[in-house]
C-alpha cells in the first residue's frame, strides 16, 4: 500500500475516534451493543444554507450539527467555518466533546457544528447572513437546556452575537445562555477568549511537573498560532517555559534562543503569518513537529502526527491543544517510544470550562469577575489532571493516559445511560 493511500485511510477523524472508543471498551468490558450505541450520534442535522452574495448571485453551503450524546446533560460544543468541514468530522468532534465534558465533570453531553465554507472569501455581510441562516435552519434543536453552541475554528464572539440575535428573533426567547463565547455586552465573560489556551498551559505545567522535572526552562514547540496556540504560548511564557518554535498554516520558525511571543503576535497581525518572524530558522509544519524540544503542543488541526512522522518526534511530552492531532497508529508508536501524551479531552478542555462558567452565570443572572473566572478554570483543570494522574497510577498504570482518560469519561457516560434506562 502506498504512503498516499495509508494517509487517506488514517485521515478520517471519525474512524480514529471509533478505534479509540473500542480500545477503551475492551478495557472496561463493554459489550458490542453498548459500543455501537456510543459510537453513533443521537442526531445529525444537515442543512443546505443559501444566501444572496454581495454580487447578487446565490451562494450555497452545506452545514451540520451533530448531537452525539445527552446522557449527562444538554449537548455542548463549538461551530466551525472551514472549507474542509465534513459530516464525519463534525460527528467525531461531537464524540470528543462527550468525553471531554464527562472527564471534566461538566453537566453536558457532546455536540459540534460546522459549515463548509472558506470565510476569507466572504464579505462581513455575507458572513452575517450565513450565520443567521444557519440558526434559522437549526433553531428547533437549540436551547440553553438542549444544545449550546460556542465558537470554534473561524468563528468568534461576533458570530455568537449574530447567532443569539437570530435565535431571539425567531423564538421570542431572550435566553442569553443558549450560546457561549459571546461578547461581554451580551453576557460573555472576558476569559472565554483565552480559556482554551489557559487550560492547555495549565495542563502542560502540571504534566511537566509530574513527568519532566517542571515547566521552568522547558523548551516548548507549538504548532498552530491562532487563538489556542498564541494564548498557550503567552501563559506558558509567563510560567517560565521557553517557547522555541511556533507555526501556522504558512509555516513556522525555530529559535533556540526563544521566541518573543508578543513580537510574534505583532508579526502575525502585520504580515498575516508567524513564518515572517525575523529571527530564527524558517521551517515547514512537518519539520516543526519533529524538531527537538521538551514539550510539543499540536494546537492546529487533527491527524498531524501519524505513523510516518511519529517515529521522528523528539519531544518528551505531547500536550494535545487541538482535537485529535494524533492518529491511532501514531498513538501506539508514541507510547512504545515512552513519550507521554496528555490527551485532547483533558488538555484543551479549558474552552468548555470557560463556556460552562459563562453559561452558569447567564442561567443564574450572577456577576463574576475575570479573575474569579480565571481561577475557576485553572482550579478545574488542575483538579481534573490530578484526578486522572492518581487514577492512572492506582488502577491502570500499564495503560497510556489517553486510554485512562477516555475510560473515566466513557464509564461515567455509560453509568448515566444505564441509570436513565438508555442501555
UniProtKB/Swiss-Prot annotation:
Membrane-spanning intervals of the chain: none
Class of this enzyme: oxidoreductase
InterPro entries in UniProt: Aminoacid_DH-like_N_sf (IPR046346), Glu/Leu/Phe/Val/Trp_DH (IPR006095), Glu/Leu/Phe/Val/Trp_DH_C (IPR006096), Glu/Leu/Phe/Val/Trp_DH_dimer (IPR006097), Glu/Leu/Phe/Val_DH_AS (IPR033524), Glu_DH (IPR014362), NAD(P)-bd_dom_sf (IPR036291), NAD_bind_Glu_DH (IPR033922)
Keyword Translocase set for record: no
Top-rank taxon, per record: Archaea
Active site per UniProt: 112
Known EC number: 1.4.1.4
A GO molecular function held by the record: glutamate dehydrogenase (NADP+) activity
Keywords of this entry: NADP, Oxidoreductase
BP GO terms, sorted: glutamate catabolic process
Reactions this protein catalyses: L-glutamate + NADP(+) + H2O = 2-oxoglutarate + NH4(+) + NADPH + H(+)
The protein's assembly and partners: Homohexamer.
UniProt name for this protein: NADP-specific glutamate dehydrogenase
Organism: Saccharolobus shibatae (strain ATCC 51178 / DSM 5389 / JCM 8931 / NBRC 15437 / B12)
Originating gene: gdhA
Amino acid at each position: 500500500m502506498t504512503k498516499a493511500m495509508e494517509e487517506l485511510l488514517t485521515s478520517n477523524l471519525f474512524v480514529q475516534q471509533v478505534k479509540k472508543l473500542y480500545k477503551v471498551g475492551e478495557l472496561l468490558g463493554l459489550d458490542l451493543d453498548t459500543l455501537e450505541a456510543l459510537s453513533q450520534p443521537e442526531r445529525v442535522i444537515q442543512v443546505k444554507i443559501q444566501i444572496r452574495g454581495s454580487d447578487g448571485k446565490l451562494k450555497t453551503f452545506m452545514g451540520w450539527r451533530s448531537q452525539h450524546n445527552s446522557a449527562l446533560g444538554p449537548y455542548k460544543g463549538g461551530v466551525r467555518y472551514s472549507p474542509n468541514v465534513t459530516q464525519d468530522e463534525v460527528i467525531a468532534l461531537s464524540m470528543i466533546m462527550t468525553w471531554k465534558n464527562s472527564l471534566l465533570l461538566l453537566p453536558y453531553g457532546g455536540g459540534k457544528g460546522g459549515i463548509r465554507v472558506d470565510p476569507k472569501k466572504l464579505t462581513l455581510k455575507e458572513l452575517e447572513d450565513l450565520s443567521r441562516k444557519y440558526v434559522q435552519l437549526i433553531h428547533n434543536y437549540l436551547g440553553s437546556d438542549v444544545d449550546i453552541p460556542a465558537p470554534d475554528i473561524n468563528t468568534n464572539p461576533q458570530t455568537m452575537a449574530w447567532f443569539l440575535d437570530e435565535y431571539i428573533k425567531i423564538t421570542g426567547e431572550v435566553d442569553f445562555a443558549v450560546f457561549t463565547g459571546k461578547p461581554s455586552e451580551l453576557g460573555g465573560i472576558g476569559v472565554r477568549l483565552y480559556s482554551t489556551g489557559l487550560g492547555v498551559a495549565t495542563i502542560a505545567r502540571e504534566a511537566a511537573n509530574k513527568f519532566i522535572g517542571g515547566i521552568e526552562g522547558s523548551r516548548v514547540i507549538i504548532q498552530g498560532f491562532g487563538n489556542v496556540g498564541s494564548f498557550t504560548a503567552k501563559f506558558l511564557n509567563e510560567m517560565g517555559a521557553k517557547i522555541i518554535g511556533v507555526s501556522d498554516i504558512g509555516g513556522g520558525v525555530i529559535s533556540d534562543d526563544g521566541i518573543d511571543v508578543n513580537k510574534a503576535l505583532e508579526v502575525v497581525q502585520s504580515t498575516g503569518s508567524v513564518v515572517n518572524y525575523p529571527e530564527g530558522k524558517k521551517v515547514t509544519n512537518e519539520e516543526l513537529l519533529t524538531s527537538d524540544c521538551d514539550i510539543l503542543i499540536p494546537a492546529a488541526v487533527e491527524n498531524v502526527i501519524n505513523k510516518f512522522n511519529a517515529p521522528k518526534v523528539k519531544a518528551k511530552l505531547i500536550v494535545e491543544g487541538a482535537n485529535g492531532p494524533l492518529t491511532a497508529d501514531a498513538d501506539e508508536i508514541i507510547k512504545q517510544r515512552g513519550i507521554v501524551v496528555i490527551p485532547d479531552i483533558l488538555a484543551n478542555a479549558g474552552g468548555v470550562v470557560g463556556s460552562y462558567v459563562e453559561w452558569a452565570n447567564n442561567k443564574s443572572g450572577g456577576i463574576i469577575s475575570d479573575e474569579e473566572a480565571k481561577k475557576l478554570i485553572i482550579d478545574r483543570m488542575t483538579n481534573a489532571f490530578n484526578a486522572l494522574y492518581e487514577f492512572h497510577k492506582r488502577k491502570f498504570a500499564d495503560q497510556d493516559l489517553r486510554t485512562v482518560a477516555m475510560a473515566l469519561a466513557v464509564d461515567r457516560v455509560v453509568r448515566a445511560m444505564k441509570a436513565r434506562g438508555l442501555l
